[in-house]
Amino acid sequence: MKPLTLKFITVFTLLLFAAPAWAWHDKTHLAAAKAGGLDSWYNAAGPDLAKIKAGNIESYNHWFNNNAEAEVTVRMVMDQIGRYNQRNKELDSEGHLYGAILASLRAYEKDLRTGKYARYHLAYCVHYLADLSQPLHNIAYDDFNQAFHDRNDGIVESVILDQPHLITRHMYRITLGDETFEEDLAREIARIANLSRYLGYRLRAEKRLMTREEACVQLGHSASLIRAVLRRYP
């Protein structure tokens, strides 16, 4: 087989498993942001709107396909930071959700230091933190993921904004140190990512949707980490 043909097949395969995925639906994102304490929670669905014009520059911030089914580590999270708002399909075919969380906070701090309005960066961060708990944003975008993704995104959409207790009853305290904030946050991102992908594998093995209770437990993880982040960025 000619090298050029082999390269084409390799790239095509990577792109196939990197097809755009959506996210929790709008009211679900708003509910997670509100439960986590974001005062401008009404902005939390905005990053999905941004995909319409920004395309893959934004969409790759929303998922990590983890085709190798590897354990998510602090190092993996940190290594993704530099890919934020990038769209290199060949070298970054799996997305970089985990790094986007930290990178959006760095962008917030940068704009704050230069006197710019920085709060929109928090809305991006909170959105990514909610995506972190969507199981199908943490596993390969395979046939199962494609078939079940949208329905999983909307599993609690009709009730969650009006019934915040469905999330808050699953929240717990997460502590992020002042001096070790990024490392602590990366550790928590990895922890929740692993919980999410394990659930994703179970859903795939059983060929089913999340239950509403499973979705609310997942959103509780996200809202708990949102609340911890906002203690530093009130």
What are these regions (language model features)?
Residues 19-120, 138-234:
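N-terminal, motif-rich segments that launch catalysis or mediate targeting to/interaction with membranes
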Residues 130, 136-137:
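Short active-site segment of divalent metal-dependent hydrolases/proteases
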Residues 118-126, 130:
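Short alpha-helix carrying the canonical HExxH Zn2+-binding catalytic motif
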Residues 1-9:
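Bacterial N-terminal signal peptides that target proteins for export
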Residues 9-17:
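Bacterial N-terminal signal peptides
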